[in-house]
Amino acid sequence: MILQVLEFNYLGVSSHAMSYQLRQAEIPILPAGHAPIRVLHFSDLHLTPARKTEIADIKSFIDLSPDLVISTGDFLAHMQAVPVALDALDALLDLPGLFVFGSNDYYAPKPKNPLKYLLPDHGKRIHGEDLPWPDLDKGLQSRGWINLNRSRATIKIKDTTIETRGTDDAHLEFDDYSLVAGKPGPCDIAIGVTHAPYLRILEGMAKDGLDAIFAGHTHGGQVRLPLPGGSRALTTNCDLPTWRARGLTKFGSEPYLHVSAGMGTSPFARIRVASPPEVSLVTLTSAPQY
């Protein structure tokens, strides 16, 4: 079975700050009788102190009343962005949260042609100075969020025990799935969290029997081809097929994959074509009983 949720019919081009769109999806993986769990999934904020629109949007996320928050990385895009990010997320940090980092949490962005992502990836990474990611890590963990970059953890949300695991950024080849590999322990469901959805990560998590995977990185393709009734990603900036560039998809018996198209862009390439900024509200529900 191949599943892909309907995408937004957005064919605009923008090079300035835009308010986000809300993507909603449902994943039927909970045991029968368990209460639904509202998961707020966001990614790729690429925050700078100047991004007032995005900061205000992030502060409004609490109004979606999530039970669990998952961030799949790239919080930062500026040396002074850590206090900005922690302030924007302040209300959400009172909720259970899981996070991993992306390349832009480690290194400042540098000017480059955004259309280069349409070319074959030769593995060469261009990045700027080191960013103060340890301060971000400390700030998030001090409020109770769990760093899944190289770890597993078990949490309980409502009446559901969730085993979680994650990897560091595969785009920088910082990932090492062997550190968290193995079948889930006692739990109701098992989920994976990673920034860049490279197939080696997805395949490892699928082999271990996870129920769902959350990722970001792709920006939904960032520059999509407008088509009647929707649009098509031209790239994912990794080896994930373009039809899975954003939203909820499922292939065969593999775990559900939810890829956030993200909120931001590099400060040097503030353009998104037919791929508006978005945040997702993913509701985990009980599987249908037949």
Segments predicted by a language model, with ranges:
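Binuclear metal-dependent hydrolase catalytic cores centered on His/Asp/Glu-rich metal-binding motifs
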Residues: 112-145, 151-152, 157-203, 269-272
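Acidic/histidine-rich helix-loop elements
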Residues: 14, 36-55, 76-78, 107-128, ...
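Conserved beta-sheet core of the metallophosphoesterase superfamily
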Residues: 98, 197-280
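Core catalytic region of metal-dependent phosphoesterases/phosphodiesterases
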Residues: 52-156
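Short, conserved loop/helix-junction motifs that constitute active-site signature segments
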Residues: 64, 89-94, 182-186, 205-208
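Active-site neighborhood of phospho(di)ester-bond hydrolases with catalytic His/Asp-centered motifs
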Residues: 41-43, 68-74, 97-103, 148-150, ...
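Beta-strand-turn-beta hairpins that frame and shape the catalytic cleft
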Residues: 20, 26-40, 145-146, 152-164, ...
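N-terminal active-site segment of His-dependent metallophosphoesterases
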Residues: 2-88, 108
